[in-house]
UniProtKB/Swiss-Prot annotation:
Coiled coil: none annotated. Upstream regulator of interferon-induced serine/threonine protein kinase R (PKR). May block the PKR-inhibitory function of DNAJC3, resulting in restoration of kinase activity and suppression of cell growth. GO terms for biological process: negative regulation of cell population proliferation; signal transduction. SUPFAM superfamilies: Glucocorticoid receptor-like (DNA-binding domain), Ribonuclease H-like. GO terms for molecular function: DNA binding; protein dimerization activity; zinc ion binding. The modification Phosphoserine is found at S566. The keyword Ion transport does not apply. Residues 116-132 have a biased composition (Basic and acidic residues). It comes from the Eukaryota. This is 52 kDa repressor of the inhibitor of the protein kinase. InterPro entries: DUF4371, HATC_C_dom, IFN-induced_PKR_regulator, RNaseH-like_sf, THAP_Znf. Signal peptide: none annotated.
Length: 761
């Protein structure tokens, strides 16, 4: 077996990392010599392939001169190495022992035959050596000619073999990425000290060797099997090339499309380091709006440094021309919102047409709540996510919550049924998430309390413990006041935000309603004392219903302990620290995100025929489209073309329906007859605020979420993540190999048949 040395009376295992083990050679003549010297009768009837695959000899059975250590990480066996050091007698001292390996007893005739065979082989090798020297002396010009031919040939045999070898390594890495197999195998603390265990990459490599892949088998035939075949450094270099080549396939399509938008998702943990996922939106050659994941940006705490690195990565590393960027959006939690706003403003300074917008995948109310710079709001949002995740851990927990809802809503069964359906979804991302939370709060508290205090021991200690922690969090008066204030403040933006994620006509008309929304919020701010009094009363009544004590936050009480002059009431405290900053921030955030340019762009949606119809074809796109004039192929004919576009749809046939989305308009058979309209629709389509109509082309974000959900934090890799998320993108193995050779190896460094490469031990 591969785990044990095949030599008689040798009990060494290949899991010993301090001792090299070698495969039996596949060459029949050499393999036969190894078998004869081993004196193993049970090995004589096995083929060289079987011996190579299943049997090993440790380095103790070879002369020291036969083993080469070209570096601390390279151990190779010479091509002519034959094992000669064996212990064939120690078992005689213990005749009752049961040996796994039977030693063959040789007769005197067999011994004489072996000796004569060795003498004949030695004389034969000497004769061949003399003939070779004579031939070289007589034909020196032939050697010169061969050297000239090698210069003419594009690749030597060694170079071709090296390329095939590298191609096999790249195939394994791509497979691991697509199937989400981590590079590392067992955890370091799982492996006993002194034992060698191959990582997942080497395990797949050995599998291909044992399956008969000639290139790999030839490369590692004389290599110690209990050492790493490919170093961590080489794996990292190759993964970077895989990532770059696969990303380039997407970036090539983006460049062909010219215009694009940049979107970042919430900060994620990749092997202990914070990264920003970056996605790109563009319209491909088939007129489909696509949103693709293109990589991670290491997060920086300093906003200015982050802005510089973000710009550098997009323009220099990825080669995108930001002059063609028409939109930017950032989905981040409250702790990172202010920093990403700095990034957006720095990009806008350099590229005014890269409009800062909301992202269609995030509800406006949740986006606004995450951006509020109040610690209590951040804590509340985190608690809400944890509660939702807790109940989605198992169907039994959701069923328990359903039962509590049924009891509480006995008199309103329809509403109870609706709430159950909502609880089974990811409701924390809804526009009305805070309304739902306030309505469900009693059910959540009772359910969590019941799970924690269950006497039937239906839940394990972890579930019961988490229920206790979450119950304490949602039963805190600070949490209750926070969600009630958010519910009421964001009620003014709920309809507006919902329309932004609706049909194209809804988005168009929403742009015109922003003024009314801001007017309402400003009125709230002017009368904040009155509004806050109502909000605080609602929070107090809810706390009383749940038997929760009304009190100031513990951190405030501790800070003012012993201060007799502090007569601040709970109501006034929450007005100054929660209600006022929340309303002020939301007003300012709406003004920032819906800039004049952004609103002008949304007004251009009147180009969509269904919107034209609702406006009775009395539209004025030309005025709003001035900001995109430089993007048009024929700007001088825009006015006439828009007139023809309106006439086309105004006088259409009765059986022809008006296209209701940009997606439908872009796929019209005659859209190319309106080149300016086509260009405008493409630019509007890629704005992050616009919904991706065909879900087939929104895979980047979904696959990113799936990768993060299914992969442990310490096993995540930014390189492998890109391969996994973009598993359907074509890849050019030859390009990857050529790139690797160009970057990391020179012609003189390519390994030959006489210097087999083995990597880190």
């Amino acid at each position: 077996m591969p785990n044990f040395c095949a030599a008689p009376n040798c009990t060494r295992k290949s899991t010993q990392s301090d001792l090299a083990f070698f495969r039996f050679p596949r060459d029949p003549a050499r393999c036969q010599k190894w078998v004869e010297n081993c004196r193993r009768a049970d090995l004589e009837d096995k083929t060289p392939d079987q011996l190579n695959k299943h049997y090993r000899l440790c380095a103790k059975h070879f002369e020291t001169s036969m083993i080469c250590r070209t570096s601390p990480y390279r151990t190779v066996l010479r091509d002519n190495a034959i094992p000669t050091i064996f212990d064939l007698t120690s078992h005689l001292n213990n005749p009752h022992s049961r040996h796994r390996k039977r030693i063959k007893e040789l007769s005197e005739d067999e011994i004489r035959t072996l000796k004569q065979k060795k003498i004949d082989e030695t004389s034969e090798q000497e004769q061949k050596h003399k003939e070779t020297n004579n031939s070289n002396a007589q034909n020196p010009s032939e050697e010169e000619g061969e050297g000239q031919d090698e210069d003419i040939l594009p690749l030597t045999l060694e170079e071709k073999e090296n390329k095939e070898y590298l191609k096999s390594l790249f195939e394994i890495l791509i497979l691991m990425g697509k199937q989400n197999i981590p590079l590392d195998g067992h955890e370091a603390d799982e492996i006993p000290e002194g034992l060698f265990t191959p990582d997942n990459f080497q395990a797949l490599l050995e599998c291909r060797i044992n399956s008969g892949e000639e290139v790999l088998r030839k490369r590692f035939e004389t290599t110690a099997v209990n050492t790493l075949f490919c170093s961590k450094t080489q794996q990292r270099q190759m993964l970077e090339i895989c990532e770059s080549c696969i990303r380039e396939e997407t970036l090539r399509e983006v460049r062909d499309s010219h215009f694009f938008s940049i979107i970042t998702d919430d900060v994620v943990d990749i092997a202990g380091e914070e990264h920003l996922p970056v996605l790109v939106r563009f319209v491909d050659e088939s007129h489909n709006l696509r949103e693709e994941f293109i990589g991670f940006l290491p997060y920086e705490a300093d906003a200015e440094i982050l802005a510089v690195k973000f710009h550098t990565m997009i323009t220099e590393k990825w080669g995108l021309n930001m002059e063609y960027c028409r939109g930017q959006a950032y989905i981040v939690s409250s702790g990172f919102s202010s920093k990403m706003k700095v990034v957006a403003s720095r990009l806008l300074e350099k590229y005014p047409q890269a409009i800062y917008t909301l992202c269609s995948s995030c509800a406006l109310n949740m986006w606004l709540a995450k951006s509020v710079p109040v610690m209590g709001v951040s804590v509340a949002l985190g608690t809400i996510e944890e509660v939702c995740s807790f109940f989605h851990r198992s169907p039994q927990l959701l069923l328990e919550l359903d039962n509590v809802i049924s009891v509480l809503f006995q008199n309103s069964k329809e509403r109870g049924k609706e709430l159950k359906e909502i609880c089974h979804s990811q409701w924390t991302g809804r526009h009305d998430a805070f309304e739902i939370l306030v309505e469900l709060l009693q059910a959540l508290v009772l359910c969590l309390d019941g799970i924690n205090s269950d006497t039937n021991i239906r839940w394990n200690n972890y579930i019961a413990g988490r229920a206790f922690v979450l119950c304490s969090a949602v039963s805190d008066f600070d949490f209750i006041v926070t969600i009630v204030v958010l519910k009421n403040v964001l009620s003014f933006t709920r309809a507006f935000g919902k329309n932004l994620q609706g049909q194209t006509s809804d988005v168009f008309f929403a742009a015109g309603s922003l003024t009314a929304v801001l007017h309402s919020l400003n009125e709230v701010m002017e009368n904040i004392e009155v509004y806050h009094e109502f909000w605080f009363e609602e929070a107090t009544n809810l706390a009383t219903k749940l038997d929760i004590q009304m009190k100031l936050p513990g951190k405030f009480r501790r800070a003012h302990q012993g201060n007799l002059e502090s007569q601040l009431t709970s109501e006034s405290y929450y007005k100054e620290t929660l209600s006022v900053p929340t309303v002020e921030h939301i007003i300012q955030e709406l003004k920032d995100i819906f800039s004049e340019q952004h609103l002008k762009a949304l007004k251009c949606l009147s180009l969509v025929p269904s919107v034209m119809g609702q406006l009775k074809f009395n539209t004025s796109e030309e005025h709003h489209a001035d900001m995109y004039r430089s993007d048009l192929p024929n700007p001088d004919t825009l006015s006439a073309e828009l007139h023809c576009w309106r006439i086309k749809w105004k006088h259409r046939g009765k059986d022809i329906e008006l296209p209701s989305t940009i997606y439908e308009a872009l796929h019209l058979p005659d859209i190319k007859f309106f080149p300016n309209v086509y260009a405008l629709l493409k630019v509007l389509c890629i704005l992050p605020v616009m919904k991706v109509e065909n879900e087939r082309y929104e895979n980047g974000r979904k696959r990113l979420k799936a990768y993060l959900r299914n992969t442990l934090t310490d096993q995540r890799s930014s390189n492998l993540a890109l391969l996994n998320i973009n598993f359907d993108i074509k890849h050019d193995l030859d390009l990857m190999v050529d790139t690797y050779i160009k970057l990391y190896t020179s012609k003189s460094e390519l390994p030959t048949d006489n210097s087999e490469t083995v990597e880190n031990t």
